[in-house]
């Protein structure tokens, strides 16, 4: 199975086939405009502007599962992302990325990667403690743990890497490797 077999909901509620992105390197992520990690939008936009002409796309899926609930519509989330952070990459309808109601795309992404921790910074230890409160066995499963978890998909449609929100330093190297 490849990413191209999935359909997702666009901002307008219509189905979007990921086969529309055949041949592109994709960075698929979950986000929340009110997240502590929302500052990453600026760096992600910089990467998008730098590599988009080389067959690189970022696909952004807003998500309310990690305590950063935004009560507005999908369109309001999009406008906030554009106004606050200058986002120009594609955004889709709000989704669940883990649990019973997770969309098939994120189930597949999670099942085909593994969680490798949050790193070793002081913030990483705090995040681990917070995530453990929700899932005592969080280290033993590949579920998405936080907003701004990113999955890198190669040009053939297969997921090749996963980046936790604390892992921005490796991200550009990963993108370059698959372009």
What residue ranges belong to the model's regions?
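N-terminal "domain-start" segment that seeds a small globular fold
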Residues: 1-19, 37-39
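Conserved helix-turn-beta segment immediately C-terminal to the redox Cys motif
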Residues: 24-25, 33-34, 38-62, 81-85
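Thiol-based oxidoreductase modules, predominantly thioredoxin-like and allied folds used
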Residues: 55-72, 87-99
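Extracytoplasmic electron-transfer domains, predominantly the class I c-type cytochrome c fold
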Residues: 74-82
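Thiol/selenol-based redox catalytic cores and closely related redox-interacting motifs
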Residues: 86-166
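Non-catalytic, surface beta->alpha helical segment in thiol-disulfide oxidoreductase systems
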Residues: 160-179
